[in-house]
Every structure is written in C-alpha cells, then in structure tokens.
C-alpha cells in the first residue's frame, strides 16, 4: 500500500464533507429558529392564563383556558419533535466524521504493519484530548465471558471494568481505580436479562490496575453504536437478540439516564414491528 495513494483517497473521500456539514448545520439552525417561535407562542398563552389568575384568583376558570391548554400542548409537542430532529442531524454529522476517521485509522495501521509508515511515538506526559480519546480503555471479549460465568454462579466481579456489570457511571480519565471502585449487587442470569444493561468505560492513562500492576485485559477495538466508535463513557446494551450494534452511547440514542426494564435500539424496534405485521398477515 502506497502512503501517497492513501492520502489522495482520503482527501477525495472527505471532499464532500464541507457541503454535507453546511447542509446539516443549516437544518439545525432552521430548527432552532422554529423552536424560538414555538416557545414564544406557548409562553404568550401561558402568560394570558397567569395574568387572569393574578387578577381573578385561582378559583374562576379562564373562559378560553381549555383552548389555550390545547394550543400550549401542541406547541410543546412541536418543540419536542424539533429537538429530536436536531439530535438526528447532529448524530448524522458525528457518524460522517466517525466513518471517515475509522477508515483512515485502519489504513494507517496497515501502512505501519507494512513498514512504509513509522509508528507514532506517544509521549507519556502528553495530556491532550486526542490522546485521551485514543487511549479509551474497554473490556475484551474474554472478560465478558468471565463475567457471565461469575454471574451464573451467583456472584458478580467487584470491578467496574467488566462488561455489562455497572448500571450507571461517568467516563473517567487518569484516575485511581481503587478510589472509585464500587460494589455490585449479585444478579442472577434470569433477572439480568430483564434489566436494561448499562456500562461505564474508564480510561486509565498509565495502564495500571488497582494494585499498580499492568492490566491483563486486552484493549477492545470493536466498533459499537450507530456512530461506529469504540466503547467509552456511559453506554446501554440493546436487548434485541440479533442486534448488530450491541452497545450504544447515551448521546447517540438520546438517553440521559439508564432505561428501566428491557431496552431496544431504534433499528431493533423497527424490525420487531415488521415481524409483528408479518405474523398478523400469516
């Protein structure tokens, strides 16, 4: 593989990104303007009701209160819809970057393996956001099997670095794992399947575990979620049996807190609905 060809191909691949980003940002800006207008509408109607209550008291009902309430709810629903559209547009932009970046990183790795490109020497003292994002530590497939085996025997490993054992937490960089280690309540396999699983992925910059010894877990470079990036921060697992993404970043699926019960990603929900329709037709 020729580095010059890789560079040329990468430049060609990203040549349309500026126009694509311009369109996405214009759409987000347009939705922002619509949001402002809708907000003005429902705030105006709310002020009418509050003004009447201040003048007449809370006992008498505003003559147009039912109509105003209906219009306020419609405006709020419209705002919610616009916000969702903005999230989809923003995630689309993120996906475009992640896709091109992932392809570039794979090509760089191939060039390094072929010996035509010198590996990048990482400075242990460098404290940049780029380094932190590339060093995000995730669990390997072997650790998943170990955790499942422990769960079947009625116990759960105490460390939060095992996959699918932590309910909630935040991304942490350069911390002492022992100071943040939390206990986990044992969960039986039957109950575990019914719980929407969430996971925290930590990054230990110095590569040491609780006792200062090198970590035995291999770095998992598997790509998850719609954005096709590695695991980091707060993530939730899809309970769909055939989900091709498995894990999702909270921001990519518009989650702020762990879902209760089983949770399915948008694609699995659509697939489930299709299967229901097929069964009804048959």
Curated annotation (Swiss-Prot):
Region of interest (Disordered), residue spans: 123-217
GO cellular component: cytosol; NuA4 histone acetyltransferase complex; nucleosome; nucleus; piccolo histone acetyltransferase complex
UniProt cross-references to Pfam families, sorted A to Z: ING, PHD
CDD domains membership: ING_ING3_Yng2p, PHD_ING
Alphabetic keyword roster: Cell cycle, Chromatin regulator, Coiled coil, DNA damage, DNA repair, Meiosis, Metal-binding, Nucleus, Phosphoprotein, Zinc, Zinc-finger
Chain positions with Phosphoserine modification: 183, 188
Biased composition (Polar residues): 204-214
Chief subcellular location: nucleus
GO molecular-function terms, A-Z: histone H3K4me3 reader activity; methylated histone binding; zinc ion binding
Bias (Low complexity) ranges: 129-143
Binding site residues for Zn(2+) 2: 238, 243, 265, 268
Cell compartment(s), UniProt: Nucleus
Zinc fingers classed as PHD-type: ranges: 222-271
Signal peptide residues on this chain, from the entry's feature table: none
Basic and acidic residues: bias regions: 191-203
Coiled coil (residue ranges): 35-86
Residues engaged in binding Zn(2+) 1: 225, 227, 249, 252
Annotated site (Histone H3K4me3 binding): 224, 235, 239, 247
Family: Belongs to the ING family.
Reported function: Component of the NuA4 histone acetyltransferase complex which is involved in transcriptional activation of selected genes principally by acetylation of nucleosomal histone H4 and H2A. The NuA4 complex is also involved in DNA repair. Involved in cell cycle progression and meiosis.
Oligomer and partners: Interacts with H3K4me3 and to a lesser extent with H3K4me2. Component of the NuA4 histone acetyltransferase complex composed of at least ACT1, ARP4, YAF9, VID21, SWC4, EAF3, EAF5, EAF6, EAF7, EPL1, ESA1, TRA1 and YNG2.
Protein name: Chromatin modification-related protein YNG2
The species this protein was found in: Saccharomyces cerevisiae (strain ATCC 204508 / S288c)
Gene: YNG2
């Amino acid at each position: 593989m020729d580095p010059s060809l890789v560079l040329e191909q990468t430049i060609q691949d990203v040549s349309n990104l500026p126009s694509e980003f311009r369109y996405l940002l214009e759409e987000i800006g347009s939705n922002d303007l619509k949001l402002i207008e809708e907000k003005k509408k429902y705030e105006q109607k709310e002020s009418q009701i509050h003004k009447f209550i201040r003048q007449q008291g809370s006992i008498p009902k505003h003559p147009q209160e039912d109509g105003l309430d209906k219009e306020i709810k419609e405006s709020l629903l419209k705002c919610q819809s616009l916000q969702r559209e903005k999230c989809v547009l923003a995630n689309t932009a993120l996906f475009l970057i992640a896709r091109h970046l992932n392809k570039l990183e794979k090509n760089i790795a191939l060039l390094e393996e072929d010996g035509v490109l010198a590996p990048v020497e990482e400075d242990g003292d460098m404290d940049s956001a780029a380094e932190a994002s590339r060093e995000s530590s995730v669990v390997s497939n072997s650790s998943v099997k170990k955790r499942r085996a422990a769960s079947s025997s009625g116990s759960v490993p105490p460390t939060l670095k095992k996959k699918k054992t932590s309910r909630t937490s935040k991304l942490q960089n350069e911390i002492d794992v022992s100071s943040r280690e939390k206990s986990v309540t044992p969960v039986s396999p039957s109950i575990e399947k019914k719980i929407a699983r969430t996971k925290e992925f930590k990054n230990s910059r110095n590569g040491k575990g609780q006792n200062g010894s090198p970590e035995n877990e291999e770095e998992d470079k598997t790509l998850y979620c719609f954005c096709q990036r590695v695991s980091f921060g707060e993530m939730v697992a899809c309970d769909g049996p055939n989900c091709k993404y498995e894990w999702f970043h909270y921001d990519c699926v518009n989650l702020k807190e762990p879902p209760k019960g089983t949770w399915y990603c948008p694609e699995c929900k659509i697939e489930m609905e299709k299967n229901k329709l097929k069964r009804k037709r048959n």
